[in-house]
């Protein structure tokens, strides 16, 4: 590419800007992480009104030499949509910072906060494997995570309490938000059920919320022993240490929240077959409830599609899984011996899928 070949200067400079933007796109993620670690969303929230830059700097745990740099961090956070500028008083020019819907999800004590998910995914332990992506394409390791650490993500987490705890809390924070929407928009999915097993349910945030909402419904969380060790159940909630590839406790319905995207097609079929063995016939109310992504095909907006693509790449880094479109989901269900399914798109970038034997 050169100007002599008919490429005009504007096109060349636009292409350069596009490359630059992608080189430095990680800065948005690191700025977000920094804002959380400094407590910026909570400080602004606790202020109770638009917070000026000097007021914010006075509250931040920053070295005096860094106070003049805070504005630059705030500027990228505003540009990224995590904060907004608003006049402090009507009729005056002075502006202060306020939270947006996105930054309200980052408050430390908010019940729907996904702060742990941000900190977990941007932890150096989980960003390191991305630097091994090209090396992985040239070897036969299962994942780039394996290339970076010489063992699988699940094996690493099972032996490293720091990663295990941060990952479980990240999944729990996502579960709290998702369950609040599910119980508001999709309560009917649990109608007629007397028992449910949450496979790979972690610390049980989803199952606990379902058990509280439906006191007659007996809920069981199935996960690996190091995940459920020491967890206490309740009247209609209990924990079961086991392997979903081996056997799943019998129940009217099996819940798979964000599980199947971790695994290859062959492994998904094995899991689904274990699910089918654990539930009664459709006539007797048996079904599998799946919460997962269905990849859009030119249906969503640019950012939604891009976010799903990000998740698919993330699966490639950490697990042998992938995000799937509807045709790929349907093939899994048929290969596992199920007869039909129903999709209810009420969970944002994820969908509620009911699969019947």
Swiss-Prot record:
Gene that specifies this protein: ROMT
Q: Which GO terms describe its biological process?
A: biosynthetic process; methylation
Q: What does this protein do?
A: Catalyzes the biosynthesis of pterostilbene from resveratrol. Pterostilbene has both antifungal and pharmacological properties. Also has activity toward resveratrol monomethyl ether (RME).
The protein's matches in Pfam families, at most eight in alphabetical order, are given as: Dimerisation (PF08100), Methyltransf_2 (PF00891)
Instruction: Could you list this entry's UniProt keywords, alphabetically sorted.
Output: Methyltransferase, S-adenosyl-L-methionine, Transferase
Methyltransferase as a keyword? yes
Annotated source species: Vitis vinifera
Q: Which residues form the active site?
A: 261 (proton acceptor)
Tell me which family the UniProt entry assigns to this protein: Belongs to the class I-like SAM-binding methyltransferase superfamily. Cation-independent O-methyltransferase family. COMT subfamily.
Protein name according to UniProt: Trans-resveratrol di-O-methyltransferase
């Amino acid at each position: 590419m050169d100007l002599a070949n008919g490429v005009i200067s504007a096109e060349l400079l636009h292409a350069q800007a596009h490359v630059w933007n992608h080189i430095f796109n990680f800065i948005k993620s690191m700025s977000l992480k920094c804002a959380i670690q400094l407590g910026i969303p909570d400080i602004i929230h606790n202020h109770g009104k638009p917070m000026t830059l000097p007021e914010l700097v006075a509250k931040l745990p920053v070295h005096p030499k860094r106070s003049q740099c805070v504005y630059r961090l705030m500027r990228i956070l505003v540009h990224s949509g995590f904060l907004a500028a608003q006049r402090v008083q009507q009729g005056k020019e002075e502006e202060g910072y306020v939270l947006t819907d996105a930054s309200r999800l980052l408050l430390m004590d908010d019940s729907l906060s996904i702060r742990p998910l941000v900190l977990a995914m941007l932890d150096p332990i989980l960003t390191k494997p991305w630097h091994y992506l090209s090396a992985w394409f040239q070897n036969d390791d299962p994942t780039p995570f394996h290339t970076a650490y010489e063992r699988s993500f699940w094996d690493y987490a099972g032996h490293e309490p720091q990663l295990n705890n941060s990952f479980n809390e990240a999944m729990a924070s996502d579960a709290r938000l998702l369950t609040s929407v599910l119980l508001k928009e999709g309560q009917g999915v649990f109608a007629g059920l007397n028992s449910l097993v949450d496979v790979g349910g972690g610390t049980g945030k989803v199952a606990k919320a379902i058990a509280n909402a439906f006191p007659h419904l007996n809920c069981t969380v199935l996960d690996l022993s190091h995940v459920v060790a020491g967890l206490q159940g309740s009247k209609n909630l209990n924990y079961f240490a086991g392997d979903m590839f081996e056997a799943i406790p019998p129940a009217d319905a099996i819940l798979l929240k964000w599980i199947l995207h971790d695994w290859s097609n062959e492994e998904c079929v094995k899991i689904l077959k274990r699910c089918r063995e654990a539930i009664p016939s459709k006539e007797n109310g048996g079904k599998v409830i799946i919460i997962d992504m269905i990849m859009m095909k030119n249906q969503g907006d640019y950012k939604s599609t891009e976010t799903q693509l990000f998740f698919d790449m993330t699966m490639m880094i950490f697990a042998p899984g992938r995000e799937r479109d509807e045709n790929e989901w349907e093939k899994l269900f048929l290969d596992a011996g199920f007869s039909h399914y129903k999709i209810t798109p009420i969970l944002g970038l994820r969908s509620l899928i009911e699969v019947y034997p």
